[in-house]
């Protein structure tokens, strides 16, 4: 609690403190690509580790999940979806002949919270023949949605597919148009696609 109430001047980080912080990370063998520290809206420290550098694009992996959630939030704000909508209603083309009740019950909100009806990621990232979105609906459910948290990349991937289906454009292009461009987000950025052309909204 001692940190509360301190003035901005008292909280200024020194170069020595930042260097010491980096040394601790390196000593603990944290796999680093780069270290950037900002204070009061300004970048005050940066260090890169080969082969990474300031001007080299880096894959952000699961950070992409946050962008997918943002896009879903914007669609809800626009009135195009409700978080209580059932995800099956948007992908009838991928549904099995008999839809399991737990799958039919699953909502967009369940997926955002990673409380789907699966206890595993449903797609095989090494497969070039099984559609990653389709596999989400073809996999046998393991439990009722909303009852169990399970960190899952496939739910974010399907939500990204939903964004692209409803907007008719790549998810990152949609986000750039709606808000990212206004805050100076990199125009060079892109999201890797799965073998079937859907942006990898959970790991790209």
Language model features: what each stretch is:
Residues 62-63, 150-153:
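Catalytic nucleophile serine of serine hydrolases
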Residues 41, 59-84, 111, 159-163:
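Active-site SXXK
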Residues 128-146, 155:
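Amphipathic alpha-helical interface segments
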Residues 47-56, 137-145, 194-197:
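Glycine/charged-rich beta-loop-alpha catalytic/anionic-binding loops adjacent to active sites
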Residues 7-26:
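Short, basic/aromatic recognition patches
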Residues 1-5:
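Short, Lys/Arg-enriched N-terminal segments with co-localized hydrophobic residues
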Residues 78-116, 138, 167-204:
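Active-site helix/loop module of the DD-peptidase/beta-lactamase fold
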Residues 22-53, 83:
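A short, well-structured edge-of-sheet supersecondary motif
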